[in-house]
Swiss-Prot record:
Example of a GO cellular component annotation carried by this entry: ribosome
Family label: Belongs to the eukaryotic ribosomal protein eS8 family.
Protein name: Small ribosomal subunit protein eS8
Biased composition (Basic residues): 13-27
Sequence segments annotated as region (Disordered): 1-31
Species annotation: Staphylothermus marinus (strain ATCC 43588 / DSM 3639 / JCM 9404 / F1)
Known partners and oligomeric status: Part of the 30S ribosomal subunit.
Gene: rps8e
Family annotation (PROSITE patterns): RIBOSOMAL_S8E
Pfam families: Ribosomal_S8e
Length: 128
């Protein structure tokens, strides 16, 4: 079955609404990427609307860390997933989303990019 991002045809009271047109192709979606911390990087290139390409990060090893007081960015290895505010179960499964806090060689880093959309992990170093 397809992932549909359109209206669910229910009124706020729970009653059914009638459909005034068919479903459109632009209302289709895709399942979430669910980027994981791993020992080997993996990306997936998919074709999106308009013939463009989107890179999805399936497995991540490194993160680009911005150090605020030094004003530079360094690529560093991820050691573990510490916390995921959006879903506590994600930290146990080593899933990485935007807002996830990971431990790196430099310290704790908060992920600022969307790995399923951008294809890269960017983050900012948290102060101690």
């Amino acid at each position: 079955m397809a992932w549909y991002q359109g209206n669910d045809l229910r009124k706020p009271t729970g009653g059914k609404k009638t459909r005034h047109r068919k479903k459109r192709k632009h209302e289709l979606g895709r399942p979430p990427t669910m980027t994981r911390f791993s020992v080997k990087e993996a990306q997936k290139i998919i074709r999106v609307r308009g013939g463009n390409l989107k890179i999805r990060l399936k497995r991540a090893v490194y993160v680009n860390v911005a150090v605020p007081n030094e004003g530079k960015v360094t690529k560093t290895r991820i050691l573990e997933v510490v916390e995921t505010p959006s879903n506590p179960q994600y930290a146990r499964g080593n899933y990485i989303t935007k807002g996830t806090i990971v431990r790196t060689e430099l310290g704790l880093v908060k992920i600022t990019s969307r790995p399923g959309q951008d294809g890269v992990l960017n983050g900012i170093l948290l102060e101690k």
